[in-house]
Amino acid sequence: MLLYRGAPAGPGAPGCGLARPGGGPQAFGIRLSTMSPRYLQSNSSSHTRPFSAIAELLDNAVDPDVSARTVFIDVEEVKNKSCLTFTDDGCGMTPHKLHRMLSFGFTDKVIKKSQCPIGVFGNGFKSGSMRLGKDALVFTKNGGTLTVGLLSQTYLECVQAQAVIVPIVPFNQQNKKMIITEDSLPSLEAILNYSIFNRENDLLAQFDAIPGKKGTRVLIWNIRRNKNGKSELDFDTDQYDILVSDFDTEEKMTGGVTSELPETEYSLRAFCGILYMKPRMKIFLRQKKVTTQMIAKSLANVEYDTYKPTFTNKQVRITFGFSCKNSNQFGIMMYHNNRLIKSFEKVGCQVKPTRGEGVGVIGVIECNFLKPAYNKQDFEYTKEYRLTINALAQKLNAYWKEKTSQDNFETSTVARPIPKVPDQTWVQCDECLKWRKLPGKIDPSMLPARWFCYYNSHPKYRRCSVPEEQELTDEDLCLSKAKKQEQTVEEKKKMPMENENHQVFSNPPKILTVQEMAGLNNKTIGYEGIHSPSVLPSGGEESRSPSLQLKPLDSSVLQFSSKYKWILGEEPVEKRRRLQNEMTTPSLDYSMPAPYRRVEAPVAYPEGENSHDKSSSERSTPPYLFPEYPEASKNTGQNREVSILYPGAKDQRQGSLLPEELEDQMPRLVAEESNRGSTTINKEEVNKGPFVAVVGVAKGVRDSGAPIQLIPFNREELAERRKAVESWNPVPYSVASAAIPAAAIGEKARGYEESEGHNTPKLKNQRELEELKRTTEKLERVLAERNLFQQKVEELEQERNHWQSEFKKVQHELVIYSTQEAEGLYWSKKHMGYRQAEFQILKAELERTKEEKQELKEKLKETETHLEMLQKAQVSYRTPEGDDLERALAKLTRLRIHVSYLLTSVLPHLELREIGYDSEQVDGILYTVLEANHILD
């Protein structure tokens, strides 16, 4: 144990051992570790490339506690020395924060707005700046103070320092005067003596290069040189770029091809363009803006995949696609907290592409679950990292296999063309820095250098106040991937089905007897609006209700599926069951703007135990229901005959669909028997076959065996229920349900005309028919009003959305103005006292100045008076008497000079050099000497 001199050495001595937590330095008594200045050079050697050192300086500007919007990288010539400068418009630093930044291992970065800081070790600036050059000056301002800090190996070598010394000088940002601290004067002297600025004014002039009232500027000189004495960075080849020196020579020496080297390895402009996964700031390299890009959105033939590590609960998105620039640049781009760590990492078939496997494919992944290395150029080689690389290899191989099988090309780099335009085009607004997705495929090279939101062709995203377009989450990607796999399986299953010939009824359907038809009165049917005319009814279910119930259609009553055709008797039962299990029940849409839609009747297929033993020819086809639209005259009393609708006939099914322009009219439902005949079938067969029960059979007619008459179910109960519904709800449950009674009554009237042998009163039926007509007309009016109200509601909703967007815009502008006003306050509240003191001092100085002004005025008056007197005396001197006076004064002056010489010789200590001989001072001195020596007595 090493102790300070004078510290107790015994083990039991008081004060020995480790210090207590919170104790001061006086309680330690143990030597502190020191850091040699040579550590600055050894620490910088962790960066194998100069661009990674530059990335460290850019990371400090991107971190959420700085939030710089613009970074300028430039090369300047100061005193014949090339200097590399980095300037940002961030928050700046106080002298205390600057001291922590120039120290080692101190970091207090926080998470803001779900943005994680990139730096975690507190070492990036030291290692990055010393990797680029030997000396660095930091200029920072935060709205109140200007601070200069020096980190220089040259200075430490000249003063032969034993530790790392960082001179820091603060200045007042208002008057640019140095703030006196205990080390400000020696720090300023050290900076002026050992930096490239030897005057204080030159030092302060560097703050003018920082845009705005806050920001930081880093100036690095003595740029690192190679062994041949040439600068490591090439500033001369490209005036708008910074290149790595002699990269062509290195490639030729290794035997490689120059084009195969990624541009990001030797061009700083290309490196800055992909440094961040989603850039949030503008970078100007040598006074020209860098075209930053989201590399995941700059690929063609993009496919998304997910990776769920076993050591974390979060899924990670992986993006695969083909490069649109150079197919020889391929691999995995691995990011961490939005920052590029490894670029073009070869995995899977890309490691040894014997026949061009994986060439041109780029993968993008953000590995926040991995730990980056100390220099942020690689990840720590752990088990998690190896598992991630293996998973990436498998997924890349699967992507390559899928794309090669789709495109049907040979695995050769020559056979596959390079896509020129990515699948999506994203561009960053130059003002709000938000990313906007442009509709269609647009070549990014055709866009202007400065793009703004109001250039967007999409009207929704033409303002900077509108948030960015939301991307798919990892959960959505998983669902879409699973859905895609299911669609692939379904397509494979449907391929043999499409080759089969769909069968139709070969024999005419049979008519049920009266007794068998009466057994169908216990069945119900529902209707639902169908948007597409190609949608066919495919199934239904039985209802245990004894009569027709006018209710809102329940999802359990019938099921639709637009993906399947009817498969009839000869098809295997297992296939029919599989199709029925895959059917989905669409929900009713009561918010449709049009009140009337096509309505087709779904047919129920109840499957019995022996249903597969009967062929389709043994089944009967009951009356089917379909919409009949009125003509232009709207003659509701005339019922038109329609053709028989067979569910298996494609041409008849298409013929039942009327033109689109008649969709806004009320349909009348007409019941038709499929085929009138006297053939009877077994009742058990009817239960097994498809059926739809819409109308009932009169009891008297059923018992007598007369021809069938169709009447609606429960007419009285239906009328009472409609009256009750209209009393509290003007909108009907369903258009089809409102049309059923009218159509059924029409069928009843026609049935009565055909069966003249019965004595049913026609007058009562006619009254009921007229009443139902009036009810239908009333429902039509109510529906028309409902549509009008819906249109007004939509207009009000659009107006509300418009004013809401305007309110958000004004609110955003208010926030901007309040922020600018807050920034305009040059001094914070803690400086108010200092400002008040300065005001009092200036006020006192003003009072003193006023007093001096008054005194000067009085002296001016006295001088003017004396001048007038002299002018008068001059006039009197011109007379003869004046000439005598002048001669007398001259004699008196000579006499006084002689007396002064005499007094000087007698009294050597007298100083008579500055005495005026025109005044009476010499006379007074002579009188004093004579009186002191008692000569006058």
Swiss-Prot record:
A zinc finger (CW-type) spans 420-472. Signal peptide: none annotated. Zn(2+) binds at C429, C432, C453, C464. The keyword Nucleus applies. It is found in: Nucleus. The keyword Cell inner membrane does not apply. GO terms for cellular component: nucleoplasm; nucleus. Histone methylation reader which binds to non-methylated (H3K4me0), monomethylated (H3K4me1), dimethylated (H3K4me2) and trimethylated (H3K4me3) 'Lys-4' on histone H3. The order of binding preference is H3K4me3 > H3K4me2 > H3K4me1 > H3K4me0. This is MORC family CW-type zinc finger protein 4. The gene is MORC4.
